[in-house]
Amino acid sequence: MSLNYLLILCFYSVILEIIARKPEIDSLKPIINVEQNESFQLMCGILKGTKPIKFEWFKNGRKIVDQSGISIDLKPTSSILFFDNILVQHSGNYSCHASNSDGSDQSSTILQIKGSFLF
């Protein structure tokens, strides 16, 4: 008795297509009111987009860098602008800009600081 074996080899071809997507920012509120002399944070989060994503913050069109009382925390899909003690002079138009190799997005808010006045 002879045994015949049929060996069938199946090869599967998998094609993985990576589609890069530009970042899409979760929009900031148009206007934010904050009391003076409080700590405050402004968060910029990504709804979708291919990593790595580069974040930048701007105040009135000028890039913000870490400075005394203001710091920037960067994560893979978000960035937080921290104010240790927010003052009236921090009022202005703030923008978060997110970019990757496929494009960019930005969102802006007007930050209004309520000061205490002594008469």
Model regions and ranges:
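Immunoglobulin-superfamily
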Residues: 2-6, 10-119
